[in-house]
Amino acid sequence: MQIQIVIHEEVDETFSTQIQKWTKEVLDKAEYFSLSAYLRLMIWKTLEEFQAFYRKEKEELGVVTGEEADFLATHDAWRGYPRIHICQERVEGIPRGVVQGAMHHEIGHAFHHGRTEFYTFRFSSSLQQAGHSHGLNLALLQQCVYFLSIAIKDQEVVQWLAEIGLGFGQLALLGYLLSDTEEEHQAWELARDSHSLRKIVLAAFLKTLLPIEAMISIGIPEAKILRNQWDEAYGWLPEKEKEGLSLFAVSIKNVEAKTFQERLERGAFRLISDACL
């Protein structure tokens, strides 16, 4: 496998060296894993240049996603091969173990989701019909499926990292993400009275819950503590919705599907039609 590391101007040498070390930690554990023949790791100095790059890429390729600066590190395969981005300015002040977990996480995505099929979604007529019957037009359905796809991919990556002995970084990362859910709370308050918008924000809340449930399922003891932390972090969410998300998180793991697209569509059907959500 060929790895190209692109270090932009003025990135601190200590920072770039540490990022490469954390990248190698995953690569050394995953020698048996089949990966694309090429991986590009891009290390940015400032948020301004990082965001400018993504704006240009989206415009050229017609890609529609969320705001990349919301994440500690990002991955994509828009050009047909896996790319990972991390910005020094973005992670300044973030605990070292959390940034390590974020890098492990994105390398995991490169292994598992390094092809365009994981970033382009099909919306079958039956799924669109189900969405329409529950108040989701195509634009809203796309948002719902987008957030669900993030959660499912994160579930797969976190479980894999835990299985190869790198779960400690994911525990740190998830704990950090649960330390502040004020934005999620605000989103819930805005969406709670709209049946269609509720589905979208609840799909977004699965980003942390699905990985936690995955680690519980393979016997990671600390994951149960993290599960309690999730309940506390989302204490403002009504019990009906919390219970519905918990049941969904367990059920989606057991969905039988041959491809990611098939699993995503079946999960979307369940999420849209679930009366508890």
Walk through the language-model features, giving the residues of each.
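Pan-zinc metallopeptidase signature
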Residues: F168-L277
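Non-catalytic, well-ordered alpha-helical scaffold segments
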Residues: G101, Q155-V158, A203
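An active-site-proximal "capping" alpha-helix that borders the catalytic cofactor pocket
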Residues: F147-G167
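Catalytic glutamate of the conserved HExxH
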Residues: A102, E106-A110, G114
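A generic secondary-structure signal for well-formed alpha-helical elements
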Residues: F111-R115, G165-F168
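Short pre-active-site segment immediately N-terminal to the catalytic Zn-binding motif
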Residues: I86-M103
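Post-HEXXH active-site segment of zinc metalloproteases
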Residues: P95-G97, H112-F147
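Auxiliary, metal-adjacent structural segments of Zn-dependent hydrolase domains
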Residues: Q2, E10-I84, G93, Q143, ...
